[in-house]
Amino acid sequence: MVDLFNYRRRQSSPVKVGSIQIGGDSPIRVQSMTTTNTNDTEACVAQAERIIKAGGELVRLTTQGRREAENLKNINAGLRADGYLTPLVADVHFNANVADVAALYAEKVRINPGNYVDPARVFKKIEYTDEEYAEELKKLEDRFVPFLNICREHHTAVRIGVNHGSLSDRIMSRYGDTPEGIVESCMEFLRICKKEQFDNVVISIKASNTVIMVRTVRLLVSEMDKADMHYPLHLGVTEAGEGEDGRIKSAVGIGALLADGIGDTIRVSLSEEPEAEIPVAKHLVDYITKREGHLLVPATESAEFDWLRPERRKTRAAGGIGGSNVPVVIASYGKDENAADVEFSPDTTPDYIYCGASLPADRREGQKYIVDFNAYKGEPDTYPIFPYNATPFIGSVKADVKFLVLQLGAPSEEYLACLKAHPEVVVVAVSNQQNRLGEQRALTHELWTNGLFNPVVFAQMYRHSAAEKADFQLEAAADMGALMIDGLTDGIWLMNDGDITVRDIADTSFAILQAARLRTSKTEYISCPGCGRTLYDLRSTIAKIKAATAHMKGLKIGIMGCIVNGPGEMADADYGYVGAGPGKISLYKQKTCIEKAIPESEAVEHLLRFIEEDRKKK
């Protein structure tokens, strides 16, 4: 059972994967996947060693055919000859026979329930009687059990890896595109593992949508608990993208689950060199696990909160904050920043700027400001903020919106009475404790339990230099992940004691909100990291598409290396670019293919032309 307010890792069963253990009392493992051709032994060994030297503890390789699966033997030998004992994981799709071969040479084999026995997804609705559905499950078991026996004989671990983008038509026909269907896709295989007493299993459920990813993993954990299953979990946001956005998106999803103690191994999927994923994963793990042994957070969960199916907490809007409004962004000028010199991007300008004890001399027209309550003089578009010990003064100050800084442990009777009497007050929830998520959740649940509808803005303070901006972004995204997905967030206020600019901080705030599907400020790219199946230059293609579409705010564009998740993830994108074979690309509008197998040299131009023409019709 997850404790919302106190960090502790979920107890999972240990799984031996070659030279390491996943789950049990082992540390959270970090891993990556090669992008080289699995038939190219030398290239695979070289790239795997770069991953290992960066700190990777497992290396996954695509094995799309028998030839690739058999070459794992040579790759393994090459690594061992160089003194590396790091386990190799075979990634198998569409061909159960390949999984049988891979189990002979890899320390772990990943299979995808969406295409292990079921045919490739074509988005076809299939009507099954209960008897027919049971027959399909029997086919699955008849094929899966011999594979488990091979793995048992060769001490090979198994990952049952569900992807939202590659659910089978069978599952989709019976359950729809729902968290329940995604979880059932995994549970079908786990029930067979339990029946066969095969315990060397790791599981994963991934999606490019962080909300779906977090909610389905939570539901999976709940269903496993009911079935007395304790398999370790592999976490990841698939097709997260690259650069800052890819890191932020991964941190929102992975961080939300790690913060609840869920996760035994992680992979941060970036459309970059695979070794670049490892420092990101390690920082996330280190940042979250430092909470172990924190001071107890005494709190009671609101009876209205549902961790498995959270809905936004009901609040009464104060100005444009809370209610049905999108979460706001508050920012603060740095101590060495001159307000007149700061230029925000039009799409990421903060809704409110905190100025301390004095307003800037050159105020921006239409910009809202926050000042300390004892410096507030009722200026237009200006609002007072009160520390928790100044609640007696709130009633004497006239303003449409007032901000009150609160931390768990403040005299509750005093501030609860104040909030009840003043619906115009927005709570700014802060914490300086090791487990800030637990404290901020606890404070919000206390308001909820007491029937208060004041909006809540979560304020997070960090200490990073400009050179450490990436760490700041990861930590902020991880801290906000669960708060946003829980439906508790009416606003975000990131602060930093360092030289990261207020513009960068504002950009990060908006990126975090977009990663959680709460507020859109730019084009979103759902791009895979690539693997041995990718037969075109993924990174240069992403750069070309971004350069031509970055101004299309609100658009979601999928850029996929191959068909494994490509068509499925297109359902979450407006347009898509999917590898279809050597030098060939297929283009999609959502999940409908609009052009097949066009030459790679023409594909970006075709995509951009189609987007422009389609947008003109709207």
Language-model segment annotations:
Residues P582-I585, T592-K616:
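Beta-strand/loop-dominated core regions that host nucleotide or nucleotide-derived cofactor-binding catalytic loops
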Residues D3, G56-E188, G319, A331-G438:
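Active-site beta->alpha loop and helix N-cap motifs at the rims of alpha/beta catalytic domains
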Residues T38-R50, F94-A99, S250-I254, E337-S345, ...:
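Short, acidic/polar
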Residues E57-R60, A106-V122, A259-E275, G487-V502, ...:
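Glycine-rich phosphate-binding active-site loops on the catalytic face of alpha/beta enzymes
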Residues V30, D91, I160, I203, ...:
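Conserved, mostly hydrophobic/aromatic
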Residues E127-F144, N149, I171-I321, K398-F403, ...:
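Catalytic alpha/beta core domains of metabolic enzymes, predominantly
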Residues M1-S32, L148-H154, K290-N338, A547:
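N-terminal amphipathic alpha-helix/helix-capping segment at the start of soluble metabolic enzymes
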Residues K53-L58, A106, F198, I262-G263, ...:
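A structural motif
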